Curated annotation (Swiss-Prot):
This is Deoxyhypusine hydroxylase. The gene is Dohh. One of its GO terms (molecular function) is iron ion binding. Pathway: Protein modification; eIF5A hypusination. The modification N-acetylmethionine is found at residue 1. Binds 2 Fe(2+) ions per subunit. Fe cation 2 binds at residues 89-90, 208. InterPro entries: ARM-like, ARM-type_fold, Deoxyhypusine_hydroxylase, PBS_lyase_HEAT. Coiled coil: none annotated. Its EC number is 1.14.99.29. Keywords: Acetylation, Hypusine biosynthesis, Iron, Metal-binding, Monooxygenase, Oxidoreductase, Repeat. It comes from Rattus norvegicus.
């Protein structure tokens, strides 16, 4: 049983800007796992922080928790034009993930936002909510991954056909996302290489999602393309950050060199992502039972 005092201690670590970013991330993922109104309240306090990376991760976690009590704070973040585009985008995506149709009107409104990543995110969230209404009771988390995705995976299982849809920029973004998540679920080298080709497509939002999915897939066939995208200083920081975190999750020796090289990058979100990714690399190659270890850090060993 988790006590109120333990949740508070983990929450204080999350919102304490003097703490190392890795510790704050581990606290965040602990709160996400615990759930409930107190966890949501602590996570919501973090949106005043100066780190866009942390704030974007706060929004992501609130979406994954799928608790409608998080809707008001996510709406306020989406509406706040002082928040960085990657933070507003993640708030829009989180509203789609929660799946409550009451935000459909708001998401439609922001589907024409002047920030293209925000507009595209809200368009996808609208399509997801409409899909949920058309397919009541269908599992959207089916498959080997437990994440709540911005689009349900396509029913197609052929990697070649999925690759064609993924890379066809004339197709609706929603259908390309469906192909992306289907490729992830199929898994293996061929799927990883097909996904990695998506890192060269036109939409920055799309490229960043490809980076995220390759991190979930954790296949080393994608390492060279992820490292090349991280190294491309003309690339959107939102995309480079996702590639860095994917390299941390894949956690092969070749990933380590790339992450160390960009830990002093001029873009704050990139260097912070490398910092968090190196912590993830250590976790993947270490003996820790779980990454979200906020409770273990509070409790003495038995």
């Amino acid at each position: 049983m988790v006590t109120e005092q333990e949740v508070e201690a983990i929450g204080k670590t999350l919102v304490d800007s003097t703490q190392p970013l890795q510790a704050r991330f581990r606290a965040l993922f602990t709160l996400r796992g615990l759930g409930g109104p107190d966890a949501i309240s602590w996570i919501s306090r973090g949106f005043e922080d100066s780190s866009a990376l942390l704030k974007h991760e706060l929004a992501y976690c609130l979406g994954q928790m799928r608790d409608p009590r998080a809707i008001p704070v996510l709406v306020s973040v989406l509406q706040d034009r002082n928040q960085e585009p990657m933070v507003r985008h993640e708030a829009g995506e989180a509203l789609g993930a929660i799946g409550n149709p009451k935000v459909l009107g708001l998401l439609k409104q922001y589907s024409t936002d002047p920030v293209v990543e925000v507009a595209e995110t809200c368009q996808l969230a609208v399509r997801r909510l409409e899909w949920l209404q058309q397919h009541p009771g269908e599992a959207t988390c089916a498959g080997p991954y437990l994440s709540v995705d911005p689009a349900p995976p396509a029913a197609e299982g052929d990697v070649g056909r999925l690759r064609e849809t993924l890379l066809d920029e004339a197709q609706p973004l929603f259908e390309r996302y469906r192909a992306m998540f289907a490729l992830r679920n199929v898994g293996g080298k061929e799927a990883a290489l097909a996904l990695a080709e998506g890192l060269k497509c036109g939409s920055a939002l799309f490229r960043h999602e490809v980076g995220y999915v390759l991190g979930q897939l954790q296949h080393e066939a994608a390492v060279s393309e992820l490292a090349a995208t991280l190294a491309r200083t003309t690339e959107s920081p939102m995309v480079r950050h996702e590639c860095a975190e994917a390299l941390g999750a894949i956690a092969r020796p070749a990933c380590l060199a790339a992450l160390r090289e960009y830990i002093t990058d001029p873009e704050r979100v990139v260097r912070e992502s490398c910092e968090v990714a190196l912590d993830m690399y250590e976790y993947e190659n270490g003996q820790d039972f779980q990454y979200a270890d906020g409770l273990e850090r509070l409790r003495p060993p038995p």
